[in-house]
C-alpha cells in the first residue's frame, strides 16, 4: 500500500463491548445478531434471543417502512454475518436451512458465494440467479429479487470471480437507479479467514479490496448527501 487507508479517513470512530450473552468472547453469529437486532444472544444463534424467541432484524424493520435491502459477502451468503440479517435459527451451521430462509426473506439482492447450499432450479422462478462475474455488467429490473452465487462456498480470489468492490458497486448502482431508500451490508469476509490461517499476504490482498470498497462507499455518500455509511 502506498497511501493512507481510506477506512482511516472516516472521521468518527467508536468502540463496543463484544462479549456475547453467554461467553466472554463472541462468535460471528452472536456479534452479527447484536448489530442486526440490537440484542445480545448466545454464540451460534442467529437473530434469536437466548430463549430462542425471534428478534426482528434491521432488514425486516426497514422492509416494513418500504426500504430495499441487499447484502454482499466474499463468504457464502449463508455465513453467519450476512445470515444474521435474515435468518432465525439456533445454529449458524445449518447452511441449507439458512439458504431456504434467505429465499423467503426481505433481502432483495444477495451477492456472494454458497452455491452448494441452494437448489438453483427451484429459485429461478422468484430470483434472477447470477453465477458468472460478467453478469454484473447487466441491468435487471425489480420484477424479481436477485441472488448472485459466484462460488460453491467462499469466493476464490481470482480474475474469474467478482471482488467485494465489484459486487458492492453493482448493488449501489442497481439500488440508486431503482429505489428511493435502501440498506446495504457489505462484508470483506476473508480478511478474517486469512487471519485464522496466519496468511499475511492473503490478508493484505483481501484488505486492499475491502479498503477500495470503503473508498467507493465514501464517494457515493459524499455525492448523494442522503445516505449514511
Residue ranges of predicted features:
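Metal-dependent active-site segment of extracytoplasmic phospho-/sulfohydrolases and closely related
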Residues: 1, 208-229
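Phosphate/oxyanion-binding active-site loops and adjacent basic polyanion-contact surfaces
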Residues: 91, 160-168, 206-210
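Hydrophobic anchor at the start of a short beta-strand
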Residues: 69, 182, 227-229
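The substrate-binding groove and active-site-proximal loops of carbohydrate-active enzymes
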Residues: 46, 155-159
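N-terminal catalytic scaffold of extracellular/periplasmic and nuclease hydrolases
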Residues: 1-119, 124-137, 144
Amino acid at each position: 500500500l502506498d497511501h493512507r487507508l481510506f477506512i482511516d479517513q472516516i472521521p468518527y470512530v467508536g468502540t463496543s463491548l463484544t462479549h456475547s450473552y453467554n461467553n466472554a468472547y463472541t462468535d460471528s453469529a452472536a456479534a452479527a445478531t447484536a448489530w442486526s437486532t440490537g440484542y445480545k444472544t448466545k454464540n451460534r444463534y442467529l437473530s434469536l434471543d437466548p430463549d430462542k424467541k425471534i428478534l426482528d432484524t434491521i432488514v425486516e424493520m426497514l422492509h416494513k417502512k418500504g426500504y430495499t435491502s441487499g447484502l454482499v459477502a466474499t463468504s457464502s451468503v449463508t455465513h453467519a454475518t450476512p445470515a444474521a440479517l435474515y435468518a432465525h435459527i439456533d445454529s449458524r451451521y445449518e447452511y441449507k436451512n439458512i439458504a431456504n430462509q434467505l429465499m423467503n426473506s426481505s433481502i432483495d439482492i444477495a451477492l456472494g458465494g454458497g452455491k452448494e447450499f441452494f437448489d438453483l432450479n427451484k429459485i429461478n422462478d422468484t430470483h434472477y440467479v447470477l453465477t458468472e462475474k460478467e453478469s454484473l455488467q447487466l441491468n435487471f429490473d425489480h420484477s424479481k429479487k436477485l441472488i448472485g452465487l459466484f462460488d460453491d462456498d467462499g469466493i476464490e480470489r481470482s480474475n474469474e470471480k467478482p471482488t467485494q468492490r465489484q459486487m458492492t458497486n453493482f448493488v449501489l448502482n442497481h439500488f440508486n437507479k431503482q429505489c428511493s431508500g435502501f440498506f446495504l451490508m457489505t462484508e470483506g469476509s476473508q480478511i478474517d479467514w486469512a487471519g485464522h490461517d496466519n496468511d499475511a499476504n492473503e490478508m493484505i490482498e483481501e484488505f486492499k479490496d475491502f479498503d477500495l470498497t470503503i473508498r467507493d462507499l465514501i464517494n457515493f455518500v459524499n455525492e448523494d448527501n442522503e445516505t449514511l455509511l
